[in-house]
Amino acid sequence: MKPLAALVTLLMAVSGAAVAECRLALVLALDVSSSVDPTEDALQRGGVVAALTAPEVAEAFFATDQHVALAVYEWSGREQQDILLDWTLIDGPHALLAAAETVAATRRGHADYPTAMGHALGFGVRLLEAAPPCARHTLDMAGDGQNNEGFGPQDAYNAYPFDEVTVNGLVVNAGDFEGELGLIPFYRAEVLHGRGAFLEIANGFADYERAMRRKLVREVTPVVIGRLDGGN
């Protein structure tokens, strides 16, 4: 039994080391439903690229020796989800720049489908299941409207394995009266999920880069045990 026990100990040590090398698996979900016009999509895509290359974001990514794994996908209808950046371990500045360049080179796959947020969340959590071993898992759901196709976020959380996943939100076009009344409360009540989940607000797509920069810094900054904030 001693050789078997030694093997189990070794495997546990190797597994623990793999997780320790990655502190966070982060997936960004971009809304390309029909309510997002071509100019807005360009601002969204460009905002992600600019945010990933911002100095304060890079500083947060490389704040410790433990890395962040990053993936990006776009979503709209029930079956319209496309990976823009597959899992990439951001283990240095060159990896972060390459990830940003990959997103910059993408083109929108769909423009005429509704907002199937529950289906998008289901796709995102399956993508997280394929991530490298990481200590934490976060999905960032960006959008400019409420779910209007298929099942909603809460049904997704009940149907898919979200127990160990934090879902943050990035609300776009929420600076107007309609957004204040409907979209922001919807995200806070229905979309945010898990310990420490939070909401970032972009006042239109022109404000997307600023909001994404702020959100990324908060998401990838290493967590201090005992000081994980609650959602807002």
Regions found by a protein language model. Give the residues of each.
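N-terminal signal peptide c-region/cleavage motif recognized by signal peptidases
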Residues: 13-17
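Von Willebrand factor
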Residues: 22-86, 90, 95-142, 168-182, ...
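Second-shell loop/turn segments in exported
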Residues: 29-39, 70, 86, 103-114, ...
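Extracytoplasmic/secreted envelope proteins and their assembly/folding machinery
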Residues: 41-49, 53, 67-69, 100, ...
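Sec-exported extracytoplasmic/periplasmic mature domains
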Residues: 49-57, 77, 125-133, 147, ...
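VWA/integrin I-like adhesion module and closely mimicked acidic/polar interface patches used
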Residues: 146-189
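Von Willebrand factor A/integrin I-like adhesion domains
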Residues: 172-226
